[in-house]
């Protein structure tokens, strides 16, 4: 019994069922879930069951029906976990279930109404109430908020919420997220404001099953650091980390298609509302979101199955970002609570059965939580050291006095401000050099202004300021001084006043920084009435006792049922044969019912295995087709030398288990200088494909040439000289000669432009000569010879 209680403290699995919705009642769906709160059992009836098929029964640490309240779930199940986090343990609370079953309602609830607040706002109130009632302890509370959207980690509190963050792993601290923002909060109002800011940028969408469906897994991380002085007189620091996880749901896409025609997920407007889930539609981002959500939840199921089996040596934490972030919460250093949310309607039988089996497997996980005491990288220790250093500087500046001295010669010396000053102001202090009368050796200069307990900094600065003002007024009233000397003394006094003001400003900045750092540390027992604290504390103790009593009662009833079964088997004395027959018949029927239930469970597991195998085969075939397509593109369209360059740049990132490209410019090398454009490997001015090289070598179309696109066949021989002979008719009739010239000119001008461009070679390049029958030509016909040559061609 004790071992069972100890194991239940490390990991608790509870089930919660919502009531039937109006939409389900209008559609005529019946309720198939029965919740036995006293025994912690859930009974699921198959609406399509064959005659004689028994309902399936599952037992959990606690069960909450439709009439349960938010406070019941928190006080009985979650409150002990938050107390453990305040003691230095790691804790995780996550809700798992079908979309629309109330995951987000369970985790967040309705913030406006106190009775409807979920786990997260109640945890806020619990943490800061505990801090205000504690004594002699210092606390530092930090908050971070992230989401996993399509296997990408996003910081919901960043100014760039769409920026992708990297997941890293440290051998000492474990898995962490690089550059994740964290905010120090001092009260409930501040941490609620942080969460509301994150909810405004969280991805949500509308589906048929839920109008406000979460499209991502959201994790709100609270880190509580506590410093307490131990019996050895040393301060010991405990660090507790609380992960509040709101998972997106998994279901069939044909049930939860989007209400609109696709589209990407939109940011949420705040907390509250129904549970999240994945939907699928014909278009938009819904199918992608659903596939990524189902992939991560499938990886979570594989991790839980591997941890529950106790046979597998490999736990597939690296299959998704979600399982890597929950690595400590599942089988590691954490106390975990899983809330399985269920839908009671008959149309959700398959999803409810899958959720119940998932939760039933999770019961067998064994966590090993331990207190995180005195870690090296605590922010609280850094704050304490910084506050102590600032306090020492303030004491050094605030307790000032004068030291009695003998003869001294004054000189000015620039003294740098102590470390921690903003912008490092330089303060000029008067330094005295004391003379040793015995050996005339100068001692090292020491400042006149030293620590003294009789005056604080403010009084000293005020006195010095008044003294300088008096000296300044005395110099102005002294008529024996020359004007130049008076001006010089006044300038020195002004400079001393300016130095004094600078020192006062630096001290005020230092004091403000000290107060700001100290205000971030929450010290218990302040500003709360002791009598009210005692009453509230007693009330909470009574609530915890009642919740513990209910838990023990439930465990005792479960134990009694097991004992009754054992005693029935041990009974062997009967008063008559009829009684023996009745008892054994009853036992036989009970065993037969168990046998049928086991057979049905085996058949369901077999069907589930076949379905999962078919899904895996389909995914494998799809990946194989995509891989073949990429290989085909690489072999036919990418040159081998380019392929080799790409292959040489590839490397395996062991942290993310992904292949990545090495940067073209190595890390640490400045790329500010302009680099020369790389030349082609074959000597051309620009890269040329293999096909173009072959075509260019064969002398085909000029489109494949990189240079010398036009080849002109030049004829270097001298032009042919023709003898001009004029006919007798043309000499006598110049009008006919002129008309013939005009007709040839018109025929040349009427040629199409393409012909003129194509035949625009000079007459000396023409390969043909004029016909020998032409024995006469005029000067005009000689000028029109290109047209004649074109006609012959």
Swiss-Prot record:
One Gene Ontology term of the molecular function aspect: ATP hydrolysis activity
Function per UniProt: Microtubule-based anterograde translocator for membranous organelles.
GO cellular component annotations of the record: ciliary tip; cilium; cytoplasm; cytosol; kinesin complex; microtubule
Pfam families: Kinesin
Biased composition (Low complexity): 256-268
Binding-site residues, ATP: 97-104
Residue ranges of the region described as Disordered: 251-288, 394-424, 750-793
Domain Kinesin motor intervals: 10-365
Coiled-coil residue windows: 376-629
Species of provenance: Homo sapiens
This protein's name: Kinesin-like protein KIF3C
Record family assignment: Belongs to the TRAFAC class myosin-kinesin ATPase superfamily. Kinesin family. Kinesin II subfamily.
Biased composition (Gly residues): 269-284
UniProt feature, compositional bias: Basic residues: 399-414
Main location: cytoplasm
Record keywords: ATP-binding, Coiled coil, Cytoplasm, Cytoskeleton, Microtubule, Motor protein, Nucleotide-binding
